[in-house]
Amino acid sequence: MDKTWLKQYPAGVPANIDVAQYPSLVALLEESFKKYAGRMAYKFMGKSISFAQIDDASRALAAWLQTQGLEKGDRVAIMMPNVPQYPVAVAAILRAGYVVVNVNPLYTPRELEHQLKDSGAKLIIMVENFATTLQQVLAAVPTKKIILTALGEIGRAHV
């Protein structure tokens, strides 16, 4: 198979990765947060967010998640579009020892119910804009803990 996309890679970017380089995804994140702490990770709504800020926010969220009675390997759903809270939530869930369940924020109530039942997610982190969809299925799903966040905020949420 001709891998035409490799021609687009910048010089020095390998065609393959060494999957044994990191023992876990958390180890990869930890190294990246440390290595790029002073760098901007992204800009959102005119605000720059550094790798250090993502690191700090995800550590705080991971610590809080571990107080919620979940067990290692439990599923935690994330229902967000491409917003700064998403990488914070992913890093926090992984750091806490849980499994990330991505949920399309455009799901209908029927689709959301199916995914939450199928995954067994016990907690969901979501942008408040989509809370009405969850509200319609909450009685039928195993997900009983909800963290709401708003567009443009990072580092605080409503539980």
Model segments located where?
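Flexible, low-complexity linker/hinge segments
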Residues: 14-23, 154
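Structural core segment of the AMP-binding/adenylate-forming
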Residues: 67-68, 95-158
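Conserved AMP-binding/adenylate-forming core of the ANL superfamily
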Residues: 20-21, 38-83, 87-91, 108-113
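A short N-terminal helical cap/helix-turn-helix that marks the beginning
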Residues: 2-4, 19-40
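Short, contiguous pre-domain boundary segments
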Residues: 6-16
